[in-house]
From Swiss-Prot:
SUPFAM superfamilies named in the record: Ankyrin repeat
A Pfam match: Ank_2
Keyword terms, alphabetized: ANK repeat, Repeat
Organism: Acanthamoeba polyphaga mimivirus
KW Cell inner membrane (keyword) present: no
InterPro entries: Ankyrin_rpt, Ankyrin_rpt-contain_sf
Gene3D superfamilies for the chain: Ankyrin repeat-containing domain
Repeat positions for ANK: 1-28, 32-67, 68-104, 105-134, 137-170, 174-208, 212-242, 246-275
SMART domains named in the record: ANK (SM00248)
Protein's UniProt name: Putative ankyrin repeat protein L92
Length: 413
C-alpha cells in the first residue's frame, strides 16, 4: 500500500497533503482497483468532516474520479455502498422530519443534516465527472443504490443520481431493473416513495420488460410476499395483463404461489385469469393445485370457471378428497350463478324497454298527453280515465297540466 493510500485509510488529511506536496502518486492503485480516492470513499466516516475534506483535496489535486480496473468498483460505487450499508436506522420520531427533508427541492436545505458529509461527497464526485453509468459486474451506480436500498436514507442518494441523469430503464446481469430492486426491498413506506421518485425524476417506465419479459409487477408476484408493493405499482399504472417470455402474467404467478391477497388486488385492477401462456394454460389449467381460498376469490369477482371432466378427476385425486369435492361444488355453484346473472343482464334491457314503451305505461300516457296539449284537444284531455293522472300530477287547471306535462316530456324526441 502506498503512503498516500495509508493516510486516507486513517482519515489523516494533514498526512495526505504532506505526501502529495512531496510528489506522491495520487493515482497509484492496487491490483483490486483500490486507489486513494476509492479508499476514502469506501471508508468515509459520517462523524469526521476531515473525510469529506480529504475527498475534496484529492479531487482538487487531480485524482481520477473514475479510476479502477475491470470488475471492481469506482470511487462513486464505493461511496454509494458506504451510504447504503452504514447509515443508522431512524426512530419513528424522526421519520416525519426525514420525509419533509426528502420532499424539499432546496439542495442547500437538503444537505443540512448530520449526514451532509456523505451526500456532499456524492455531489462532489458527480460534479467532477464521476461516470454515472460505469459498470461493475453489470451494475451501474443506480442499480447498486437500488439493490442496497434497505434504509430510508437510500431515497436521498437515489434522487441525486436521478437528477444527474442516471438511466432507469436498464437491467443488471441477473436481469433486475432499478424498479425491481427497489420494489423487492420495500419494507417501510418511504421505500415506496423511493419508487415514486424513480418514476417521477427518472422517468422509469413502470411497464418496462427485461430480457425475459418480466415487468416489476410480474417480478414481485413471482418472488415476493409484499402485496402492498403490488398494489402500489398497480396504483401507479402497472399493467397486470402484460405477459413475460413464457406467456405468464402476474396473476399466473400469484395464483401458483397461493398469494391470496395479491390475487385479490390483481383482480381488483382487472387482471384477466383467461390469458393463455405459451404452454396453452391459463390460471385455471392446474385447478387441482389451486387452493379453495384462491377459487373463492375468483368466484367473488364473478370469474366463470369451466371444469373439464379431466380437471374434475384430477381434483378428486388430491390427498384431501373432501376439499376436492368442496372445490368442485364451489366452482359449479358459481357457474350456475354466473349463467343466471348473464341471462338476467341480457334480458333486463329488453324487458325494461318493453315495459317503458307499453301503450298503458306512464311514460306513454305522458307522451300522449303532451301531444294532446300541443294540439289543444281539451275534450280528449279531460276524460274520466285521465282523472287519476291529474291526481298523480297534482294539477287543478289546464295551465298547470300543460306546464307539468311539458316539463316531464321536454327531453322526449
Amino acid at each position: 500500500m502506498c503512503a498516500c493510500k495509508f493516510a486516507t485509510y486513517n482519515s489523516n488529511i494533514g498526512a495526505v497533503k504532506l505526501l502529495l506536496d512531496k510528489g506522491a502518486d495520487i493515482n497509484c492503485m492496487r491490483k483490486d482497483g483500490m486507489s486513494a480516492l476509492s479508499a476514502v470513499c469506501k471508508n468515509l466516516d459520517l462523524e469526521f468532516r476531515s473525510d469529506f475534506d480529504t475527498i475534496k483535496l484529492l479531487i482538487e489535486r487531480g485524482a481520477d474520479v473514475n479510476l479502477t480496473v475491470d470488475g471492481h468498483y469506482t470511487p462513486l460505487m464505493w461511496l454509494i455502498k458506504n451510504l447504503s450499508e452504514n447509515d443508522d436506522r431512524f426512530s419513528e420520531s424522526k421519520i416525519s422530519s426525514i420525509k419533509n427533508l426528502f420532499e424539499s427541492d432546496d439542495d442547500d436545505y437538503f444537505f443540512e443534516n448530520k449526514r451532509k458529509n456523505k451526500y456532499n461527497a456524492l455531489k462532489l464526485l458527480l460534479d467532477n465527472g464521476a461516470n454515472i453509468e460505469a459498470k461493475c459486474d453489470g451494475e451501474t451506480p443506480l442499480l447498486l443504490a437500488c439493490k442496497l436500498s434497505s434504509e430510508i436514507t437510500s431515497t436521498k442518494h437515489i434522487k441525486i443520481l436521478l437528477k444527474k441523469g442516471a438511466k432507469t430503464n436498464i437491467e443488471s446481469n441477473d436481469r433486475k431493473t432499478p424498479l425491481m430492486l427497489l420494489c423487492k426491498n420495500c419494507q417501510q413506506y418511504l421505500e415506496n416513495e423511493a419508487v415514486d421518485v424513480l418514476i417521477k425524476y427518472g422517468k422509469a417506465n413502470i411497464n418496462y420488460q427485461n430480457s425475459i419479459g418480466e415487468t416489476a409487477l410480474i417480478y414481485l408476484c413471482r418472488i415476493s410476499f409484499m402485496s402492498e408493493s403490488v398494489q402500489f405499482l398497480l396504483e401507479k399504472g402497472a399493467n397486470p395483463n402484460i405477459q413475460d417470455n413464457s406467456g405468464n402474467t402476474a396473476l399466473h404467478y400469484a395464483v401458483k404461489r397461493h398469494e391470496f391477497e395479491m390475487v385479490e388486488i390483481l383482480l381488483r385492477y382487472n387482471a384477466s385469469p383467461e390469458i393463455i401462456n405459451k404452454k396453452g394454460k391459463n390460471v385455471f389449467s392446474n385447478m387441482h393445485k389451486i387452493s379453495i381460498g384462491v377459487v373463492e376469490q375468483l368466484c367473488r369477482y364473478n370469474i366463470n370457471i369451466q371444469l373439464s371432466a379431466a380437471q374434475k378427476y384430477s381434483i378428486l385425486q388430491t390427498p384431501s378428497f373432501v376439499n376436492g369435492v368442496k372445490l368442485i361444488g364451489l366452482i359449479e355453484s358459481n357457474t350456475k350463478i354466473k349463467t343466471i346473472m348473464d341471462f338476467t343482464i341480457n334480458v333486463i334491457p329488453k324487458k325494461v324497454l318493453k315495459i317503458i314503451y307499453h301503450e298503458n305505461s306512464l311514460k306513454m300516457k305522458l307522451v300522449k298527453m303532451a301531444w294532446l296539449c300541443r294540439n289543444y284537444s281539451i275534450d280528449k284531455i279531460i276524460t274520466m280515465e285521465n282523472f287519476w293522472l291529474f291526481d298523480y300530477l297534482n294539477v287543478e287547471t289546464i295551465d298547470q297540466l300543460k306546464y307539468k306535462i311539458t316539463e316531464l316530456t321536454k327531453y322526449e324526441s
